[in-house]
Amino acid sequence: MSAAPTSGPLTCRRAGPLRGAIEVPGDKSISHRSLLFGALSTGETRVTGLLDAEDVHSTRKAVEALGAIVREEGGEVVVTPPATLREPGDVIDCGNSGTSLRLLTGVLSGVPGLSVLTGDASLRRRPVRRVIDPLRAMGANLSARDGDRLPPVVVRGGPLRGARQVLPVASAQVKSAILLAGLFAEGETTVVEPEKSRDHTERMLRGMGVPVKVSGLEVSVSAARPAGGRVDVPGDISSAAFFLCGAAALPGSEVTVRNLGVNETRTGLLDVLRAMGADVWLANLREVAGEPRADVTVRADRLEATEIRGATIPRLIDELPVVMVMATQARGRTVIRDAKELRVKESDRLAAMGETLARAGARIELYEDGCAIEGPTPLRGVEVRTRLDHRIAMSMAVAQLFCGGEPVVLDDVACVATSFPSFFRLLDQVAARVSVGGAP
């Protein structure tokens, strides 16, 4: 293909095993936090490897609206913070980014003035009460649509008090919103999780000089401002998952993803791949700016079914759609439970993947909090309604590898720009051919 598709329908056709070495774009979670924490800091923050995608653009526009200056300089993104965050002059549009909206809700709760946070049609259907309730317990003045369930969110910033918050569901976004509000609060703020969620907020704040106390599943902060500094963003394991899962299940495949973030709160996928029998190894393991990274190689092998539940779920929640695809090629019954969080992402990902894979021939049973998939099952070509969800689109592009040459037609791929604009170019690079406009 001559150029990666950016919008409109797209037809994927299999072109043999996946082979090669690639680098995926910067981690989305770390990229968001780099910009936001830089805006909160007392000094300049310089970021390398920042993800260039729509979600991160939303955070950049938001911090600029709060008075930060963000510029590109010599291959780095430089964030110069204001002396104090200012009241925004207009509504802050977070686009499709739930991370932007939730983390900003925590920050703006402690910033004097009126702020309104909204987003696109998809974001305005995503729940915010789980953030509003704990922030209100700290004294935040917040309101939202539909009985405080849905965005837009209106924030009237003011004094906050520290509190001990026990979360019913492990969520890095909710945890981070509370901790960021805690930087503005009087007294200590503590978050207790039922399971460990991704810990980029804790690592990055500590790296910027904020005292962060971690004890088991408890995290505590007190009022402080980060000092700024340097952030080197590793590759995003959630983006790499499409290639790693495809390589694990497609005979003859071997893919290496270089400079990949392997923070232990994000490597549930690697544990699952090993449990299913794939060959997985890490090389060049090192730690940069507080985040471990490595070159990760996956080689195809005969996959066996496994169970995925409990503490593993928060460590691979975003990867589960493509794990569901991989499970169709594993021998036996793969069971995923405790993943109800999938129902409140950009789409109801359990329902979307279940319905689409079933039409493609998969033997799948859905539960309220997960699914069971029998395999191995040859898939067939299918037309996919992506629901404007980037992970549905990319997961079903991978599913096409197992369709025996039959095409998978995605109704619109513009959503891929949310997190991974170069996805189809890299997929082409490691051997899967795509074509645009519905043509083979």
From Swiss-Prot:
Q: Which positions bind phosphoenolpyruvate?
A: 28, 98, 126, 173, 349, 391
Any idea which positions bind 3-phosphoshikimate? 28-29, 33, 171, 173, 318, 345
Reaction it catalyzes: 3-phosphoshikimate + phosphoenolpyruvate = 5-O-(1-carboxyvinyl)-3-phosphoshikimate + phosphate
Query: One GO BP annotation here?
Result: aromatic amino acid family biosynthetic process
Q: Which GO terms describe its cellular component?
A: cytoplasm
Q: Where is this chain's protein located in or outside the cell?
A: Cytoplasm
What pathway or pathways are given for this protein in its record? Metabolic intermediate biosynthesis; chorismate biosynthesis; chorismate from D-erythrose 4-phosphate and phosphoenolpyruvate: step 6/7
Q: Which residues form the active site?
A: 318
Q: Name one GO molecular function term.
A: 3-phosphoshikimate 1-carboxyvinyltransferase activity
Q: Which UniProt keywords apply?
A: Amino-acid biosynthesis, Aromatic amino acid biosynthesis, Cytoplasm, Transferase
Chief location bin: cytoplasm
Report which superkingdom the organism of origin falls in.
Bacteria
Q: Which residues form a coiled coil?
A: none
Q: What is this enzyme's EC?
A: 2.5.1.19
**Biological role:** Catalyzes the transfer of the enolpyruvyl moiety of phosphoenolpyruvate (PEP) to the 5-hydroxyl of shikimate-3-phosphate (S3P) to produce enolpyruvyl shikimate-3-phosphate and inorganic phosphate.
Sequence similarity: Belongs to the EPSP synthase family.
Quaternary structure per UniProt? Answer: Monomer.
* Protein name stated in the entry: 3-phosphoshikimate 1-carboxyvinyltransferase
State the species of origin.
Anaeromyxobacter dehalogenans (strain 2CP-C)
Specify the taxonomic lineage.
Answer: Bacteria, Pseudomonadati, Myxococcota, Myxococcia, Myxococcales
